[in-house]
Regions:
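A conserved, well-ordered hydrophobic junction motif at loop->secondary-structure transitions
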Residues: 39-65
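Hydrophobic beta-strand-centered segment that forms part of the acyl-chain substrate-binding groove
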Residues: 67-101, 106
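HotDog/MaoC-like acyl-thioester-processing domains
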Residues: 1-8, 94-96, 105-145
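Residue-level recognition of well-ordered beta-strand positions that form the cores
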Residues: 41-43, 86-88, 103-105, 119, ...
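Non-catalytic linker/capping segments at the edges of enzyme domains
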Residues: 1-47
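N-terminal short leaders/motifs
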Residues: 57-77, 117-118
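Hydrophobic core residues within well-ordered beta-strands of beta-rich domains
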Residues: 36, 81-83, 100, 114, ...
Length: 145
């Protein structure tokens, strides 16, 4: 796996909840490229629980949406916005776990619409949450601005 350098790190005003390394309230994700997949290894924290020692479903959705955005960024060399996200919660995630792993890849491309599949695994490599995200992507010229 190859670590992806965050191109916005150090940019004034950059405070993304998903990936800004200095956003104390954020989830501060980091990403790696592994073949066709984008991967993130993330440490659950107690402040993100919904129920006692259980990772909040909304935080799980944030993690899945964010990794899908990085698939668009890295694999298509552009940016976009989420237009639809279907999420399936299969198993709870313990906030005391040492880590979770997220993996995402492109399923389909139709012009500027990209379908991305993402999975969230617990420390035992069990699929806990799955998402299919539909992204509306921007032309590269617009994304650079």
């Amino acid at each position: 796996m190859k670590k992806i350098i965050n191109p916005w790190k150090g940019l004034e005003g950059y405070n993304c909840f998903g990936c800004a390394p200095n956003n104390e309230a954020g989830v501060r994700m980091e990403f790696y490229e592994d073949g066709e997949e984008i991967v993130s290894i993330w440490k659950p924290r107690p402040e993100y629980q919904g129920w006692i020692d259980t990772l909040h479903g909304g935080i799980q959705a944030v993690l899945l949406d964010e990794i899908c955005a990085w698939v668009v960024l890295r694999k298509l060399q552009t940016t976009g916005v989420t237009s639809k996200m279907e999420t399936r919660y299969r198993k709870s995630i313990d906030t005391k776990d040492s880590h979770v792993v997220l993996r995402a890849s492109i399923k389909e491309i139709k012009r500027n619409i990209v379908i991305i599949e993402a999975k969230l695994y617990n420390k035992d490599d069990e699929v806990c949450t799955e998402a299919v995200c539909t992204y509306f992507t921007f032309p590269q010229e617009k994304a650079r601005k």
